[in-house]
């Protein structure tokens, strides 16, 4: 963590459970042999690709501030927290991550995100994307919602009675009913 590493070979450390290699200069990271890994922080590198498909025990993934244009987490069913902000993501499929409670995907190029199956979600930060719609009606445990800087024209929050933080400035909203969020 916080070095100037441009290479990191961990392929032989098969029992590795946690890896913090954030704030380096890594352009690639091979974690395919690290099938025991539960916590991976590779924030603030130069990664253009990250394959976590074999890391099925992964619970915490932080890959903010890289150059990722795609992130496939279809096999990561144990994921509880995902932070993938400040990348170049255009799509993000989180429908298989049913345990997800925190999602930070801000400052990407997302024009849609489906959180309808992520009913455990309590924190969602999707600000500064290109979202046209955001349906959080199934996310009744949602407490923190940051969706500022998108292109939302409608935001229904009447089922999100647990909401304690909301930031939705810089959208196309004409009205916002918060009467159920008292």
Features from the language model and the residues they span:
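Leucine-rich repeat
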Residues: 2, 13-16, 32-37, 53-58, ...
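Extended charged/polar low-complexity repeat regions
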Residues: 17, 89-92
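Conserved hydrophobic beta-strand positions in leucine-rich repeat
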Residues: 17-21, 38-42, 59-63, 80-84, ...
């Amino acid at each position: 963590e916080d070095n100037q590493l441009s290479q990191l070979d961990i392929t032989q450390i098969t029992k590795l459970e946690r890896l913090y290699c954030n704030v380096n200069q890594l352009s690639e990271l091979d974690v395919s042999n690290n099938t025991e890994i539960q916590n991976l922080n590779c924030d603030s590198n130069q990664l253009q690709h990250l394959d976590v498909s074999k890391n099925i025990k992964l619970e915490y993934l932080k890959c903010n501030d890289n150059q990722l244009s795609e992130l496939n987490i279809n096999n990561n069913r144990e994921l509880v927290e995902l932070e993938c902000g400040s990348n170049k993501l255009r799509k993000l499929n989180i429908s298989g991550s049913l345990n997800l409670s925190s999602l930070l995907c801000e400052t990407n190029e997302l024009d849609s995100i489906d959180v309808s199956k992520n009913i455990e979600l309590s924190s969602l930060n999707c600000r500064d994307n290109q979202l046209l719609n955001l349906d959080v009606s199934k996310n009744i445990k949602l407490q923190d919602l940051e969706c500022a800087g998108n292109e939302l024209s409608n935001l229904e929050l009447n089922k999100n009675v647990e909401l304690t933080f909301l930031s939705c400035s810089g959208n196309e909203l004409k009205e916002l009913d918060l009467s159920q969020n008292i």
